[in-house]
Design a protein with these regions (language model features):
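Short, small-residue-biased leader/transition segments that mark boundaries at the very start
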Residues: 1-5
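Core hydrophobic positions of leucine-rich repeats
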Residues: 6-8, 13-17, 24-34, 40, ...
Length: 203
């Protein structure tokens, strides 16, 4: 019966975790709850100690991301696969704002087949320039088959990153790229498969 409940869950009350101020991990919180489609903006507002949101909404039907979802989660280090394989079409520019301790965004938006665009400030607004690991952006937009463009400056300031492996692998709708997309990422040693399967790219 547990499976039945999980598969029908569409959303949760905003104050569900309001009194759980000591929570440090929400790993896989809604992962693979296929019916889950809406998250209240203040769901994590009273959880300032959270360190990891790994696979948070992975494999759900999440349609949109509310502004300020992580506004009070300044200690988070891990966003790996947090939104992977969801139905989101866009993300707010300030989604990671103030999350200055992030170590990885790896695979964060992998398989978001409905995602059409991303804001230029998405990662910069975190301020996590010195805390991200060398592979923090591997697979970041892998298989985002509806993504048509990448904004200039998306990765600006992340000077310690050494790899962007598979970052846009399978982005079949991507038609153009900004000239200086990796201009400030001077430590990079590997771009393996970064634009593999980007069949719409025009020179």
């Amino acid at each position: 019966s547990e499976m039945c409940i999980r598969d029908r869950l569409k959303t949760v009350p905003e104050k569900l975790f309001a009194n759980n101020k000591k929570v440090t991990t929400f790993n896989s919180l809604f992962a693979n709850s296929e019916s889950f489609e809406s998250v209240p903006a203040g769901l994590f507002a009273n959880n300032p100690e959270v360190d990891s949101f790994r696979m948070l909404f992975s494999g759900t039907s999440l349609k949109s991301v509310p502004d300020g979802l992580f506004a009070n989660n300044h200690k988070v280090t891990n966003f790996q696969s947090a939104f992977s394989k969801t139905a989101i079409q866009s993300v707010p520019a300030d989604l990671f704002a103030g999350c200055g301790k992030v170590t990885t965004f790896m695979s964060c938006f992998t398989g978001c087949s409905e995602l059409q665009s991303v804001p230029a400030e998405l990662f910069k607004s975190s301020g996590a320039f010195t805390t991200v690991t060398k592979t923090a952006f591997n697979n970041i937009f892998k298989d985002c088959t509806s993504l048509t463009e990448v904004p200039a400056g998306l990765f600006d300031g992340f000077t310690l990153v050494t790899a962007f492996n598979d970052a846009f692998n399978g982005c079949a709708s991507l038609t153009t790229l900004p000239a200086g997309l990796f201009a400030t990422n001077t430590a990079v040693t590997s771009f393996t498969n970064v634009f593999k399967g980007c069949t719409s790219l025009k020179s």
